[in-house]
Every structure is written in C-alpha cells, then in structure tokens.
A protein has these predicted regions:
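Substrate-binding rim/cap in mid-to-C-terminal beta-strand-loop elements of soluble/periplasmic
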Residues: 89, 252-280
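Loop/turn elements at helix/coil->beta-strand transitions in domains of secreted/extracellular proteins
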Residues: 34-39, 66-70, 130-137, 181-186, ...
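Active-site nucleophile/metal-coordination loop of metallo-enzymes that catalyze phosphate/sulfate
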Residues: 26-35, 48-129
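Catalytic-site neighborhoods of secreted/periplasmic enzymes
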Residues: 96-101, 115-166
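Second-shell loop/turn segments in exported
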Residues: 26-29, 45-50, 74-75, 108-115, ...
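Bacterial Sec-dependent N-terminal signal peptides
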Residues: 1-30
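Active-site His/acidic residue clusters
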Residues: 143-158, 172-216, 220
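Metal-dependent active-site segment of extracytoplasmic phospho-/sulfohydrolases and closely related
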Residues: 40, 59, 213-251, 262
Length: 280
C-alpha cells in the first residue's frame, strides 16, 4: 500500500486551496463546491493511545464521526517535534528537507531543493505563490515552530504560548483572527499535550486531563469558524506531531509513532475511515 509523507493532509490542502485561485489565464475548475478555507490545528504530542483508552474529547470524536479519520497515522523518524512538523508542512521526509532533530531551526542536512528564499518549499509559501491575495495565518505556542515555515508568506503570525496566566494558549488569538479575517489557510499549533507527556507521562491522569482541555480549545475554534459564517466552506484538519512512552519521545515503536488524524468538512462522506497508510 502506497505510503505518503504528507498523505491526505497535503492532498486536501492542495485540492482545497486550488479553488481559491482566480487567475484569469487558467480555465475554471470543473468541480463545484470546493472548500474555500482550510484550518489546520496541531496538538503536539497527541496520541491515538489516549483516544483508545478513555480520553473523552467529544469535539474531536465529533470530527471523526462527521468526516474522515484514521488513528493509525504514523510520525516520521525520529518521532520528535520539529522534524515532524517540518515534514507535514513541507510534504517530504528529513532526508529531503534536512530538518532532523527535535529542535531544528535550520536544516542539519542541506535541503534537496530550495525556493527563491533559499528554503525547502512548504504549503504556506506555495499557496502564497498561487494566490497572492489570500489570507494566511499562523498562530503557535512553541517558539520553535517559527523556524519551520515561510514567515514571509504569512498575512498574520502570532506567538501565543500557553501559561498559568493564559491557560487557553493560542485559542483566543485564533478565535478572534478567524472571526475577523476568515482566513483561506490558517495553522493553529498548540505545544500541548507534549509538555505534559514529557513531564508527567504519556498515560498519566495529567496527560488525559490536558487532552480533554485541548478538546475544549478545539470547540472554541470550531465555534469561531461557525460564527464567522464559513463552516460549510471549510475543511478542518487536526494533526499531532508524535507520541512518546513514559516520559520520553523519539522512539521507533508503533506506540510512539501512531497518532490520530481527523478531517471535517460538511460536504464530504461521514465516518470515512482513511484506508491508506499515512505518514507525517
């Protein structure tokens, strides 16, 4: 069965964003009712294990029920944060884009190809090239995420870490941005439950409490999409970078690499189980 590094996520984004291109020199697309917006939500360290072992996450489960999903999406190797997010954003593995470590800020290996900004191509820059007027947002909690994207492609970029004073992290910023700007492409990347998994353990009560809290953040983002009046034209994708074991990460076991991947769009088949091997 064919494996894909960026799998359906890249295909859906490319497919959806092609609908926003109105360049006069191109013939109009034959397909109708294509989505106009893509919201990519990332929960760093989210595991399939927690969903199979008691995590409530009602909004997450509703996404699975109303769209397409798999609980067997595998991280790349090594299964740690920066190199996995880079692979999802760039549609290639570390051997090509060159980001190989947990905290990579620049490629440890020379990128196989680079764009005009001397970076390996990523979905944000590629979309900006295709749709110069598009609204593209990037909201993130972990500072390391800033080094994995084409920042020049962003219409809006905000670092909003989760803290005791700000327990919802980047959620308030994302909610306001979605309501005001109705972005064509927006990535909202949380630093949790990764921190709790490393600090307390990937099967700890604290980890399960955190993923349920993140589900409430997901609810707020989904409500914002709805209140912005764009729900029917929006694909929402939820992705995780990796999982760990006990308090570690980066291993080669399926338990450390398996993570969930749901897609939600009102105009597509419900409860669809993604049949292909997926990786990213």
């Amino acid at each position: 069965m064919k494996k894909q590094i960026l799998f359906i996520c890249c295909a859906v984004i490319a497919y959806c964003l092609s609908a926003c291109n109105t360049a006069p020199q191109q013939a109009p697309l034959k397909e109708k009712n294509l989505p106009k917006h893509v919201i990519l939500i990332g929960f760093d360290g989210l595991s399939a294990h927690c969903l199979n072992n008691g995590a409530d996450m009602p909004t997450f489960r509703k996404m699975m029920a109303e769209g397409a999903s798999t609980l067997e999406n595998r991280s790349i190797l090594p299964s740690s944060s920066a190199c996995n997010w880079a692979s999802m954003f760039m549609g290639a593995g570390p051997e090509l884009h060159g980001y190989t470590e947990w905290g990579s800020r620049t490629p440890e290996l020379p990128s196989r190809v680079v764009n005009s900004d001397n970076r390996f191509p990523n979905i944000f820059g590629l979309y900006r090239d295709k749709a110069p007027e598009a609204e593209i947002g990037y909201i993130y909690e972990w500072e390391g995420m800033n080094y994995l994207v084409d920042t020049l492609a962003m219409s809006f970029r905000k670092h909003a870490p989760m803290s005791t004073e700000n327990p919802n992290g980047c959620t308030p910023v994302a909610v306001q941005y979605i309501k005001e700007k109705k972005p064509n492409l927006c990535a909202i990347i949380y630093d949790q439950p990764d921190g709790t998994g490393h600090g307390k353990g990937w099967s700890s009560p604290e980890y399960f409490a955190m993923v349920n809290h993140l589900d409430s953040c997901l609810t707020q983002v989904m409500d914002a999409v709805r209140e912005a009046g764009i729900m029917d034209d929006t694909v929402v994708i939820l992705a995780g970078a990796h999982r760990g074991n006990q308090t570690g990460a980066g291993g080669q076991t399926v338990k450390k690499r398996a993570k969930p991947l749901p897609f939600s769009w009102k105009k597509r088949k419900k409860r669809f189980q993604v049949p292909r091997s997926t990786q990213g």
